[in-house]
Regions:
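Catalytic nucleophile loop
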Residues: 55-79
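Pocket-forming structural segment of enzyme catalytic cores
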Residues: 76-157
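Acyltransferase
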Residues: 153-216
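Flexible gly/pro-rich beta->alpha loop and the following alpha-helix that scaffold active-site loops
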Residues: 3-63
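Glycine-rich, phosphate-binding/catalytic loops in enzymes
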Residues: 43-47, 80-81, 129-130, 163-165
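Glycine-rich nucleotide phosphate-binding loop and flanking beta-alpha elements
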Residues: 34-35, 69, 118
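Short amphipathic alpha-helical segments and helix-helix/interface helices
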Residues: 49-53, 102, 200
Length: 216
């Protein structure tokens, strides 16, 4: 993306050693098996929520995927609850409103889901997409963009997921199978790649633009 990136896993750390916030051009919070509010077991989640609030308050670009989407939403006041049923595998979402990152999207699109919890829409948030089980599949609020679904998954990452016993257990509990999920991935991946590129390159461009303000 033209910027130096730092990847950190801080969920187990009560006081994580984070980079200087003022020097960050953007923040991305990814997924994980824990709940967004499991602060007692994963104290670093509180630091991530604080980071999300600070990013939005300062206009710094921040992107959340799955758990990251839930962390940003709850940090901004949304309610978290268990979904009526796990949403795992490929299933459709409906675009409610157009974000510039989503300008290529059809009204309905089939994407990869892997979550148990759902969040509401933060006050003043703009709903971008929804599905029948999950009322907030994507939203934006100021500099924040949250996506409950997984556009980041490539073939090698899917293989890693399907080598993880706990994820395979969740998949089977939701009525899926490894073979069927791989078939679905082969069916939809080529359709999703340009949309994924649009979202992530668009976010990277915003980070690059924000970086210019740090150098002034």
């Amino acid at each position: 993306i033209g910027l130096e990136t730092v990847t950190m896993n801080i969920v187990d750390k009560k006081k994580p050693d984070l980079p200087d916030f003022g020097e960050l051009a953007g923040v991305v919070i990814m997924g994980g098996p824990m709940g967004a509010l499991d602060y007692d077991k994963y104290p670093g989640l509180k630091a991530e929520a604080k980071l999300a609030r600070a990013a939005v308050a300062s206009g710094k670009p921040i992107l959340g995927v799955c758990l990251g989407h839930q962390i940003i939403a709850t940090a901004l006041g949304a309610q978290l609850r268990k979904g009526d049923a796990p949403e795992i595998g490929f299933a459709p979402i409906k675009r409610v409103d157009k974000h510039d990152f989503f300008s290529m999207w059809d009204k309905q699109l089939t994407v990869l889901h892997w979550h148990n919890d759902v969040v509401g829409l933060p006050a003043e948030g703009q709903l971008l997409s929804r599905s029948s089980p999950t009322k907030v599949q994507a939203f934006r609020l100021g500099s924040a963009l949250g996506m409950q679904f997984h556009l980041e998954v490539c073939g090698s990452l899917l293989d890693e997921w399907l080598d993880e016993p706990s994820m395979v257990k969740d998949l089977k509990a939701a009525g899926g199978s490894k073979s069927h999920l791989r078939e679905q991935f082969a069916q939809y991946d080529q359709l999703l790649q340009p949309l994924s590129e649009q979202v992530f390159s668009g976010f990277a461009a915003r980070c690059n633009s924000y970086a210019q303000t740090l150098n002034k």
